[in-house]
């Protein structure tokens, strides 16, 4: 059912080079499910269906909008992991300074629509949701709550700093206070 595979990525690091590297799975003999990396609407639908059943313990016929939101979020996370691990591998292979930003709050806003846009699969997600009987992606996006990581302008400013660093491909990590 699963195909054994290695992922070859081209990552633009902070040195502005596009060097291919082989992103090996962490444990020999691990398997990567190709459906968890697929970007077409069928793969997104299959990922959502699998997360509804295996992660949330729901059938598609009894799934609420919140269940579909969670399933879509998990399916998007699966697809983001390839990029995340590729970034970590670039940093591991070419150690460089990392910016550490400390803030009492980060007001990052809803993330699902942003992640869909960054992956380029907004239309594919909407097509997958139509197969569940949801006519508009906005119906599911409205379910997402604002992460409670701040309450004002400084939190939004901290989030803007982090987004700018990411856009400039500067290795950065944000540290906050959990209260």
Give the location of each predicted region.
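Flexible, polar/acidic helix-loop-strand segments at domain edges
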Residues: 1
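Polybasic, lysine-rich low-complexity intrinsically disordered segments
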Residues: 4-5
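A conserved ligand/cofactor-binding region detector
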Residues: 12-179
């Amino acid at each position: 059912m699963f195909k054994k595979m290695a992922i070859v990525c081209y990552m633009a690091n902070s040195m502005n080079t596009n060097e291919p590297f082989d992103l090996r799975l962490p444990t020999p003999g691990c398997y990567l499910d190709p459906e968890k990396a697929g970007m077409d609407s069928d793969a997104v639908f299959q990922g959502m269906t699998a997360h509804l059943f295996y992660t949330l313990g729901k059938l598609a016929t009894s799934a609420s909008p919140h269940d579909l939101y969670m399933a879509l979020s998990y399916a998007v996370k699966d697809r983001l992991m390839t990029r995340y691990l590729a970034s970590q591998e670039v940093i591991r292979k070419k150690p460089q300074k990392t910016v550490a930003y400390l803030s009492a709050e980060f007001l990052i806003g809803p993330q699902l629509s942003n992640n869909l846009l960054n992956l380029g699969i907004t239309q594919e997600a909407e097509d997958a949701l139509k197969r569940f009987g949801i006519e508009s992606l906005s119906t599911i996006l409205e379910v997402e709550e604002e992460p409670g990581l701040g309450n004002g302008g400084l939190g939004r400013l901290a989030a803007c700093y982090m987004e700018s660093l990411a856009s400039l491909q500067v290795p950065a990590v944000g540290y906050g206070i959990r209260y």
